[in-house]
Amino acid sequence: MALAKRIIPCLDVDNGRVVKGVKFENIRDAGDPVEIARRYDEQGADEITFLDITASVDGRDTTLHTVERMASQVFIPLTVGGGVRTVQDIRNLLNAGADKVSINTAAVFNPEFVGEAAQHFGSQCIVVAIDAKKVSGPGETPRWEIFTHGGRKPTGLDAVEWAKKMEGLGAGEILLTSMDQDGMKNGFDLGVTRAISDALGIPVIASGGVGNLQHLADGILEGHASAVLAASIFHFGEYTVQEAKAYMSKRGIVMR
């Protein structure tokens, strides 16, 4: 039997506030991540991903406090990422109530950190986030490269090979964002999603580009992802998580 697939709403948080606007009806304060996460929990989300985009060090304490509040009110798995550089950072987040921790830039600069983290805490806690951009031209063999700093800095690393390396070091899951598609609302980059999903034995979460429910289903049916992540289609109340799950079930996808 096929493993059940997951829908994961994503919150971008800066200094304890959600920054990609959220326009749910009946939310008193659209900026409070705990209230928003609770709404997604009620709607039947399988997990929540919380990406801390605060640059400042003082923002970190706010983040830990927010994670503590969220973990006390939301009863689905919580992945937290952003600025995770040390084993102590991971320990702090797990102690605050995160179930999984996402490592992005630090993995590129110090791949062994992923292995160390997996040894300390177990692969099931360690997600490696990959930001990939297509670098091949028309007619060339498709190739995607890892970028850092919000898609601004190329690394020269091949995205598929890098994902395999991360799996080998002990990552339990890959969060794959297509920088070309992010925010475009015309669907995932199914090419890179499929290339990485097919190359790995661990789950791949597709991210970047969801504009409608068909895009979510495509990520799984055509991209072979294990889970799909979206922000704005849920934040702005265009669709609820229930509607997304119902649509995907109708397309024959076994949902959690």
Curated annotation (Swiss-Prot):
One of its GO terms (biological process) is L-histidine biosynthetic process. Gene3D superfamilies: Aldolase class I (3.20.20.70). Its main location: cytoplasm. GO terms for molecular function: imidazoleglycerol-phosphate synthase activity; lyase activity. InterPro entries: Aldolase_TIM (IPR013785), His_biosynth (IPR006062), HisF (IPR004651), IGPS_HisA/HisF (IPR050064), RibuloseP-bd_barrel (IPR011060). The active site is at D12, D131. It catalyses: 5-[(5-phospho-1-deoxy-D-ribulos-1-ylimino)methylamino]-1-(5-phospho-beta-D-ribosyl)imidazole-4-carboxamide + L-glutamine = D-erythro-1-(imidazol-4-yl)glycerol 3-phosphate + 5-amino-1-(5-phospho-beta-D-ribosyl)imidazole-4-carboxamide + L-glutamate + H(+). Its EC number is 4.3.2.10. NCBIfam families: hisF. Heterodimer of HisH and HisF. This is Imidazole glycerol phosphate synthase subunit HisF.
